[in-house]
Amino acid sequence: MTIGALPPTMKAVVLEAPLKIAVKDVPTPTIQKPTDVIVQTTVAGLCGSDLHIYRGHIPIPLPITVGHELVGKIVQVGDEVTKWKVGDNVIVPFTATCGDCYFCKKGLMARCDTGITFGTGRGLEGCQAEYLRVPTADTFLFPQPDDIPASTLLLMADILPTGYFVASGGKRLLMESLGQPMTGDLVKDVEGKKEGVCVVIGCGPVGLCAISSAVRMFDKVFATDLAPHRLETARRHGAIALPEEELKAAILEATDGRGADVALEVVGHASAMLKAIDLTRYFGVVSSCGVHSEPITTSGYMMFNKGLRFQWGQCSVPTYFPGALEVLRDNKEIFAKFIEKKIDFSQAEEYYALFEKNKIGKTVFVMGGEKDV
């Protein structure tokens, strides 16, 4: 089924080479398999993870349409799709997954046997375009709630579930280390009782999502960032946000000299990971969702001596979506301010350059100039 005939070409944000973005006319996607849908974009996000591809740190075939965050309307449906119909408004998580492999069945969709992140190649273009082909649509899309604007809901495609993932992973490992029982209900387990001191390294968009999640789980949440203007924003999300030179002393004072129970590393740089390790107490927890592209060098004996527990990796959005959505519902006004810029595709080259230089915060592309979405 379809809503009329789609145009043969569409506007798309294309990475032609590292640091070289262009807005081009490209072929409009079509249904390739009966489990596909075609989604017309309402809003598409510019995410910090996009910078790893933009800078050339992650090798992918070029040119390619970039982006992996999208909220939009289904305009075509494959013959074997059962959960969705033309006209449905949906949130598209950043990775297409099969729903049937070992990892998907365990709720670990980030490691799906056939999973593909939008805008990274392997036959799946990115979300920063007027239309998007979504494979295996019955397995990982979510309906768009009516009470939250599309631009705010875009956070649910990646960074808010990722923030919830990194915070809840730290809390679960802390509970495990303390021998506390868990029911298997993720939200109930990690939010049932606030406990422990947490520190978040990095107060960019993902860091703020981690902070808003962590304040539901821990007694105290500290945070730091090298960019001073981000600290005030982190405070609005509930953190005790301090410059790096003041952070360690404050954490030691709050913990009788032990260090943080849990550190959340969301930057993806070796210095941030080493900072997280340094601030964490003996037998504490480090939980990381940072995308690291360089080696991390540290002392094996120091690591042995600290006895830390680690969680590290990519978020399985469907598993963490329910908890993250409640964080969003309870903080709608804060997250509405989270979107700093609403732009159209014609401004992509300019805003990628600004985002790469850390001169702007969360930015979204909106279709048709509708800035109130």
What are these regions (language model features)?
Residues 269-330, 366-373:
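Glycine-rich phosphate-binding loop and adjacent beta-alpha segment
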Residues 91, 264, 287:
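N-terminal Rossmann-like NAD(P) cofactor-binding module of classical short-chain dehydrogenase/reductase
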Residues 27-44, 55-105, 125, 145-147:
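Glycine-rich beta-strand-centered segment in the early N-terminal region that forms part
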Residues 2-8, 274-278, 318-373:
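C-terminal hydrophobic helical "lid"/dimerization subdomain
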Residues 260-266:
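Short SAM/SAH-binding signature in class I
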Residues 247-257:
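Short amphipathic alpha-helix with an adjacent loop that forms part of the alpha/beta core around
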Residues 47, 93-142, 146-150:
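Cysteine-cluster motifs in flexible loop/terminal segments that predominantly coordinate metals
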Residues 148-249:
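Mid-domain Rossmann-like dinucleotide-binding core that forms the NAD(H)/NADP(H) cofactor-binding site
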